[in-house]
Amino acid sequence: MKIKVGFGFDVHQLVEGRELWLGGILLEHEKGLLGHSDADVLVHAICDALLGAANMRDIGYHFPDNAGEYKNIDSKILLKKTVELIAAKGYQIGNIDATICAERPKLKAHIPSMQQVLAEVMGIDADDISIKATTTEKLGFTGREEGISAYATVLINRV
């Protein structure tokens, strides 16, 4: 069995007048993430990790931010398409380990919902998705609440 590991990272700016989508769910917050799509940094980091593990470039290559068809798209659609892309190359997801960096909103209570939603999109068990949340102790752009970032590591294996 061929096992591969991928790493993904994404960051988006927090702005007024946008909804805050994280981990495939809508969160109540006075600001949202700015981006061509819904700007869900966690989903984008997972997509990049999956594509990287399969040596299939990155999310911007497959879903360019200058393509009208992806304007304001639900990132869960991009995730589903990413899973289909790696499956077409003969890979399935083993597990995902991800971290969201945000000062606010507090995310602990939302993590089980994120796991469930993302598991359904990817067709895997929620137990195979670890999501953690942390702050940067008020340091940097995250600490100043100017943006939110996410990191993801994935394991995929050849079917």
Swiss-Prot record:
> So where does a divalent metal cation get bound?
D10, H12, H44
A molecular function GO annotation = 2-C-methyl-D-erythritol 2,4-cyclodiphosphate synthase activity
Family annotation (InterPro entries) = MECDP_synthase, MECDP_synthase_CS, MECDP_synthase_sf
- Which GO terms are recorded in the biological process aspect for this UniProt protein? isopentenyl diphosphate biosynthetic process, methylerythritol 4-phosphate pathway; terpenoid biosynthetic process
Query: Which EC number(s) does the record attach to this protein?
Result: 4.6.1.12
The free-text note explaining how the cofactor binds reads: Binds 1 divalent metal cation per subunit.
Leader sequence residues: none
Which cofactors are named for this entry? a divalent metal cation
> Keywords for this entry?
Isoprene biosynthesis, Lyase, Metal-binding
Reactions this protein catalyses: 4-CDP-2-C-methyl-D-erythritol 2-phosphate = 2-C-methyl-D-erythritol 2,4-cyclic diphosphate + CMP
**Which cysteine-cysteine pairs are annotated as disulfide bonds in the entry?**
none
Pfam family example for this protein?
A: YgbB
Pathway the protein acts in: Isoprenoid biosynthesis; isopentenyl diphosphate biosynthesis via DXP pathway; isopentenyl diphosphate from 1-deoxy-D-xylulose 5-phosphate: step 4/6
Q: Which residues does the annotation list for site: Transition state stabilizer? A: H36, T135
Query: Which residues take part in binding 4-CDP-2-C-methyl-D-erythritol 2-phosphate?
Result: D10, V11, H12, H36, S37, D58, I59, G60, T134, T135, T136, E137, F141, R144
PROSITE patterns per the UniProt record, alphabetical: ISPF
Entry function: Involved in the biosynthesis of isopentenyl diphosphate (IPP) and dimethylallyl diphosphate (DMAPP), two major building blocks of isoprenoid compounds. Catalyzes the conversion of 4-diphosphocytidyl-2-C-methyl-D-erythritol 2-phosphate (CDP-ME2P) to 2-C-methyl-D-erythritol 2,4-cyclodiphosphate (ME-CPP) with a corresponding release of cytidine 5-monophosphate (CMP).
Q: Which family does it belong to?
A: Belongs to the IspF family.
Note the subunit structure.
Homotrimer.
User: What is this protein's name?
Assistant: 2-C-methyl-D-erythritol 2,4-cyclodiphosphate synthase
